[in-house]
Design a protein with these regions (language model features):
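Active-site pocket-lining/capping segments in soluble small-molecule metabolic enzymes
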Residues: 1-121, 139-140, 146-310
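Residues lining hydrophobic/aromatic ligand-binding pockets adjacent to catalytic sites
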Residues: 135
């Protein structure tokens, strides 16, 4: 590992009131040890008007704090106005763009850009193809097992790889809005009910066990992926960036814990214990990383004589 990897902050996936969204990023700018911040609505174009009035001042605050800015595209484009928005974003943005939908790739060809975690990069051949078209960094999908991550990174030189290290995992997106339907509304008259669930709406089994969460037209995991115990192994394998996906909790504290573990100021086990206090009520998981079901938690085995991970 030639240098300590950096941390990035992904776009807010949920619908927050504009002032809350603005103040969240103001605090990130002033206090969070992240080097790069992704901004933009990736889930539902109907949410644009909540955040766009605050975007310029958020960017200014982040840039004044030395943060790098990347603008993220929608993850599903179904309407002409959404297509126009993506085209305009790519044509006019003074910042790098993160593609979260294949429809953006043709417009980005030949321009340095980032591939987001909602684009299915499942092998090195795909990563190399994207790199040949201008991708300089790729955030791998959170469902990839570590063996696949290692192989893709090893077989794709000259690309920065990012791993989804914290947050509820984006699993699916639809043209229909199950969140609105769950509240008795339709998508065209949703009344923005997803705003009432700033961390997602729990979906339960018949046995009343939470197993997914709704976020407008998006489905995310009930559990929160946390790769604190895997950071150093991933860094040794060549992963250069770790993405923190905003949840409705103290994300500055989350970023500090990850920074402390990465730099060796804190043991991963202590970091996990702190994380559970910061984000209570949502189970942590790392199952996908270990080739298990995504909701599983695989505890680290320790060599008690040497304190090494097994």
């Amino acid at each position: 590992m030639s240098q300590i990897p950096t941390m990035t902050l992904g776009p807010v996936l949920y619908l927050w009131e504009g002032e809350k969204w603005r103040d969240f990023y103001f605090r990130i700018a002033d206090e969070a040890p992240v080097t790069q911040v992704f901004l933009g609505e990736t889930v539902c174009s109907k949410r644009f008007h909540f955040t766009e009035p605050h975007l310029a001042e958020v960017i200014e605050r982040l840039e004044n704090a030395g943060k790098q800015i990347v603008l993220s595209t929608l993850a599903l484009v179904t309407l002409e106005r959404e297509s126009r928005h993506v085209r305009g974003l790519i044509a006019d943005s003074p910042y790098p763009v993160e593609a979260n939908d294949l429809s953006a790739l043709g417009m980005l060809r030949g321009t340095p850009h980032v591939i987001g975690p909602m684009v299915n990069v499942y092998n090195a051949a795909t990563a190399r193809l994207l790199a040949s078209r201008g991708a300089t960094a790729i955030c791998l999908p959170p469902e990839l097992p570590v063996e696949s991550v290692n192989r893709i990174v090893a077989d794709t030189p000259d690309v920065e790889f990012e791993v989804f290290a914290f947050g509820r995992m984006p699993l699916a997106i639809s043209a229909r809005c199950a969140h609105a339907r769950s509240k008795g509304n339709i998508k065209d008259n949703c009344q923005f009910v997803c705003k009432d669930d700033p961390d997602g709406l729990a979906v339960k089994t018949l046995d009343q066990q939470s197993f997914l969460a709704l976020n407008g037209v998006q489905t995310v995991s009930h559990t929160c992926q946390s790769l604190l115990g895997e950071l150093h192994d991933l860094a040794q394998a060549g992963v250069s960036r770790f993405r923190l996906s905003p949840q409705d909790c103290d994300m500055v504290a989350v970023a500090r814990i990850y920074d402390d573990v990465l730099t060796g100021r804190c043991d991963a086990d202590d970091g996990i214990a702190q994380m559970q206090r910061i984000y209570p009520g949502v189970p942590l998981s790392n199952g996908f990383h270990h080739g298990r079901e995504g909701a599983a938690w695989v505890a680290r085995a320790r060599n008690t004589a040497h304190g090494a991970n097994l």
